[in-house]
């Protein structure tokens, strides 16, 4: 994973875990890699993964069972709520960017309605829209 130098690494790992849950890469109830294994995979210190896991647990998206491991929550309602919030933020940023270019809300709506859809390969489309 490439990291953005302007954002703490643990925050980027939290976002990756959230996105993997939202796009189904990590299934409900699935066991996450151990802190040590995830640190090796992500090429970071174990303390960074530990913090990311703890923050994910605080967000309610994973649960840790002492001596067993960390697991994706099985609360579909919460996952749906997080997905809706993610979509809202993407749309809000999209509108903000177009307004910064001088488009009105009505013009933005017309652009969305009249822009031909871009076809992405299925495997890429889920990843691109959850970043």
Predicted feature residues:
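Extreme N-terminal segment that seeds HTH/winged-HTH DNA-binding domains in transcriptional regulators
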Residues: 1-31, 37, 85, 89, ...
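Short alpha-helical segments used as structural interaction elements across diverse proteins
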Residues: 13-15, 48-51, 62-63, 80, ...
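Beta-hairpin "wing" of winged helix-turn-helix
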Residues: 25-26, 30, 58-67, 71-74
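N-terminal helix-turn-helix
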Residues: 31-63
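Residue cluster at the C-terminal edge of the helix-turn-helix DNA-binding motif
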Residues: 41, 58-61, 76, 101, ...
């Amino acid at each position: 994973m490439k990291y953005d130098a302007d954002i703490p690494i643990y925050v980027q790992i939290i976002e990756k875990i959230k996105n993997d849950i939202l796009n189904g890469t990590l299934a409900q109830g699935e066991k996450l890699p151990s802190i040590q294994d995830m640190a090796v995979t992500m090429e970071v210190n174990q303390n960074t993964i530990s913090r990311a896991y703890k923050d994910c647990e605080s967000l309610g998206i994973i649960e840790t069972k002492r001596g067993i491991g960390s697991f994706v929550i099985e609360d579909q309602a919460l996952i749906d709520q997080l997905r809706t919030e993610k979509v809202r933020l993407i749309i809000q940023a999209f509108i903000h960017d177009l307004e910064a270019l001088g488009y009105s809300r009505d013009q933005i709506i017309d652009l969305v309605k009249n822009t031909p859809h871009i076809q992405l390969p299925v495997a890429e489309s889920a990843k691109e829209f959850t970043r």
